[in-house]
Regions:
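Mature catalytic domains of secreted/periplasmic carbohydrate-active enzymes
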Residues: 1-398
Length: 398
């Protein structure tokens, strides 16, 4: 929209045919009603999915914030504009009341595509300056705009300070660019320490931060530095896309196997759900999240409070390893046959027991023996194979 006329895309053609040339981006703000939004339903869903934390978008690149701000900072907020609600606060409050074990966090974009005062800092596809109506090539006003002396000092700093005051435990920044994150982080970390709270920051705030964030991607091997893979349940969008076929959404099996692969390499898994304009999460996403959550809760000991096996995270395409202070865990990402053979050096010696984790056969002892070539063979009965889905986990207690 900064680039003026562009008639070479499907989006351009669809917009022109459906809405006409005079309806522009900011006109869609009024369609965002959140009329069916229930923050309790959301946090209950997150808990049902087996999550330990959630990251709520507080402001994306369009500069529309989902929380309240002083009028001398911006009026481009969900409080000043439709739906006239402080959505981040409502979600945080619901989490504290109904699912207090969930850690609360926010996503925050430092730059804004079209903020007039970002123009002097603009770079790449974040040039700042007013958007252009691509159909008639005219500059557009920036709804809710308040003139600022300096975008970084007068916009980024008070927004990040407000989110910190609201109690975010993760500052999940995006894009980077000009910032005053050093000063912000110093005050935020020190205050959290005084309150005996743990807070972290990703690597996109302008500092190296505490963890890296590959997007719609993951690492092939163990990373000693913590990382978090983020992707949408919709393979094409972090938002809601009505054109996405239901069969294309990430299913429970893919959620579980992705989670196992990621944690075996010292990562976390951040899974995006894109709500509709009325604040509901589509049924297919809810179904898949809850199905995955049943598996995650049943196998929690092999997932949470574990870390990577320093020798190797995996064996081939379908075996992953995790460890805890008390046990070594073998994860099979496919249903095992009658014999599961492992050639990797794992901490098993003659006489050690191996048991099933999770599923209908939880706690069942699995016979094990060492082959002549030094490999370990687990004898997996039909009952054990049939007793689980998505992934099969075996435990060697220390």
């Amino acid at each position: 929209m900064n680039e003026g006329p562009n008639n070479g895309t499907d989006t351009y053609d669809y917009h022109l045919k459906t809405y006409g040339k005079d309806l522009v981006y900011d006109d869609f703000i009024r369609n965002f009603t959140a009329s069916a939004w229930d923050p309790k339903e959301w946090v209950d869903l997150f808990a049902d999915a087996g999550a330990n934390y959630f990251v709520q978008v507080s402001k994306h690149h369009d500069g529309y914030t989902l929380f309240d701000l002083p009028e001398n900072v911006t009026k481009r907020t969900s409080v000043a504009l439709s739906p006239h609600r402080n959505l981040v606060k409502e979600l945080f409050d619901a989490s504290k009341k109904y699912q207090p074990h969930l850690h609360r966090a926010v996503y925050y974009s430092l730059p804004e595509w079209f903020h007039p005062d970002y123009k002097k800092y603009g770079f790449s596809i974040w040039p700042g300056g007013n958007a252009t109506n691509p159909f008639i090539n005219e500059s557009l006003p920036y709804t809710g705009y308040v003139p600022l002396t300096d975008y970084v000092t007068d916009k980024i700093v008070p927004e990040m300070d407000t989110l910190a005051e609201m109690g975010t435990e993760i500052m999940w920044c995006d894009i980077g660019g000009p910032n005053r994150t050093t000063e912000f982080a110093s005050a935020w970390f020190n205050k959290a320490a005084e309150q005996n709270r743990q807070v972290v920051m990703n690597a996109r705030c302008g500092l190296p931060g505490d963890f890296d964030t590959p997007e719609y991607a993951r690492y092939n091997g163990v990373q000693v530095r913590k990382w978090e893979s983020n992707l949408g349940m919709d393979p094409f969008s972090y938002g809601y896309n009505r054109a996405t076929p239901l069969a294309s959404y990430l299913n429970a099996s893919s959620i579980v196997t992705s989670l196992i692969d990621i944690i075996s390499k010292n990562g976390n898994f951040l899974l995006d759900v894109g709500p509709t304009a009325n604040g509901t999460i589509v049924d297919i996403e809810q179904q898949h999240l809850r199905q995955a959550g049943l598996w995650i809760k049943s196998h929690a000991e092999a997932i949470f409070n574990t870390t990577y096996w320093f020798v190797t995270p995996e064996e081939g395409e379908n075996i992953r390893f995790t460890i805890s202070p008390d046990a070594f865990y073998i994860h099979s990402l496919v249903k095992p046959s009658s014999t599961l053979t492992l050639s990797s050096p794992i901490p098993w010696v003659d006489g050690d027991s191996v048991t099933v984790v999770g599923g209908k056969m939880h706690g069942t002892v699995v016979p094990v023996h060492r082959l002549n070539n030094g490999s370990i063979a687990l004898i997996v009965s039909k009952e054990v194979s049939a007793g689980d889905q998505y992934a099969w986990v075996f435990k060697i207690p220390y």
